[in-house]
């Protein structure tokens, strides 16, 4: 649901990763669903692959920094080519530092649905207010 251990906090806390992961689980209700993931650092790739494998979702996970100019960072171009070959049903930008420009870049390259962690979390917060 996005709430974690509510008994431990005097005020409910929303966890962006949990919110987005539950949304992806719901969205992935078809056979052979494939997920593309972009993380901010390579040391997170293995953990992310394991997480989706446990959920029986085939995922291709990449890493690149959202804090560089997307037009001058060849990694974004390389990742988009790899994801195009993988042909995911959905792409998840799993970093609160990734922005609309990253989402637009990937959408234009792949013509696929892209979930941006900040947008998903913001939508939930907006609906709760």
Question: Language-model features: where?
Answer:
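Non-catalytic structural scaffold of enzyme domains
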Residues: 1-129
């Amino acid at each position: 649901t996005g709430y974690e251990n509510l008994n431990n906090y005097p005020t409910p806390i929303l966890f962006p990763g949990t919110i987005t992961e539950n949304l992806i689980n719901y969205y992935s209700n078809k056979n052979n669903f494939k997920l593309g993931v972009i993380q901010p650092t390579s040391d997170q790739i293995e953990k992310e692959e394991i997480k989706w494998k446990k959920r029986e979702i085939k995922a291709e996970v990449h890493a690149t920094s959202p804090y560089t100019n997307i037009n001058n960072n060849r990694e974004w171009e390389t990742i988009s080519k790899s994801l195009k070959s993988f042909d995911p049903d959905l792409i998840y930008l799993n970093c609160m530092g990734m922005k609309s420009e990253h989402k637009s870049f990937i959408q234009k390259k792949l013509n696929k649905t892209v979930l941006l962690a900040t947008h998903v979390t913001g939508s939930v917060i907006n609906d709760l207010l």
